[in-house]
Amino acid sequence: CMKMETNGGGAGKIIGRMFSGETLFRNSYTANKDGLIAFASSFPGKIVAIDVEPGKEVIIQKSAFLASEENVETSVFFNKKFSSGIFGGEGFILTKISGHGTCFIEIDGSTVEYNLLPGQQMVIDTGYLAMMDATCKMDIQSVPGLKNKFLGGEGLFNTVVTGPGKIVVQTMPISAVANSLARFFPQGK
C-alpha cells in the first residue's frame, strides 16, 4: 500500500519554488511494503536520474525538477550575472540540487553531455543548457557583428559556460519548438 502526503515545506520553500518554476507543493509517497511509483515528463524528451552527493551540487534549468528521494534538497539559485537573466534563455533564477540521493529531472528532447576542463568554455544557444555542475560558471554573451545578429537567425545572445564540470545540453527546448510551430498557426487580426 502506498501512502501519499502533500506538503509545502514552509513559506520560504513555497516562495522559492514559485521563483524557480516548480509546483508550490510536493507530494511525498511512502510504501508500507514493496511497491513501485511511476512519473512522466510534461513534454517529449528524456527523464535523467542524477546521483546527488554532499559537495557535488548541480544547477538545473527552472521547472526541470521532476522527483527525488527525500534527502535531496532543491533551492533557488540566482545567477550572479544579472545580464544572464535579462538577455539569456536560461534566466538568472535556476534550481540548485543538493543533499544525498537520487533526483530525476525532465529535459526537452535528447541530451548531449560534455565534461569541461578548468577554464574551458562552451558557447551554446540560449535556452539549450539543461544542467551543469555547480563548479561551472554561466554568462551571457552578445553575438558579434551586425550581420550575425540580423541575418544569422540564431538570436542576439549566446550562453557561455566555463568549466570545470559536466554540462548537459538539451536538443529540443519547448521554447524553440513553440517558435518553430508558431508560423503554422493563423494570425488573428
Set out the residue ranges of the language-model regions:
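Phosphate/adenylate-binding glycine loop and adjacent helical scaffold
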Residues: 1-189
